Amino acid sequence: MTSRQSLIVAMLTAVIALAPAPSFSHSLLVRSQPGQRSTVTRPPERVQMWFSERLEPAYASASVWNEAGKRVDAGDASVDQNDPTLLSVSTPNLGPGRYTVRFRVLSVDGHVVESSYIFTVRAPAR
């Protein structure tokens, strides 16, 4: 192999090694209010969830369920227009108890993520 061919091979190897790799990440839940596995003494008016990527509003859903398996949210889950990583749903009149938040989102990379987490509302101390 000539020195010119060796130089070309070395340059091509460097270009391939330094090229950015495609991203294969999915939209991950990075923060929520109430937090995952948290206990609060004041019932939230809304459950809010922030994700690692922008969400597709038409394919995002969230629901809140009580211990008896009854849906207790207002059915108004939506992606925030000013923050496309924020999905929230109203939770009127939550009493003390354990709640499960279920969500399903489609991120702009085309991947569906479906999961759930719990939080607890505890009666305030008297």
Annotate each language-model stretch with its function.
Residues 90, 95-104:
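A glycine-anchored, Pro-Gly-centered beta-turn/N-cap motif
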Residues 24-43:
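N-terminal edge beta-strand
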Residues 1-11:
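Bacterial N-terminal signal peptides that target proteins for export
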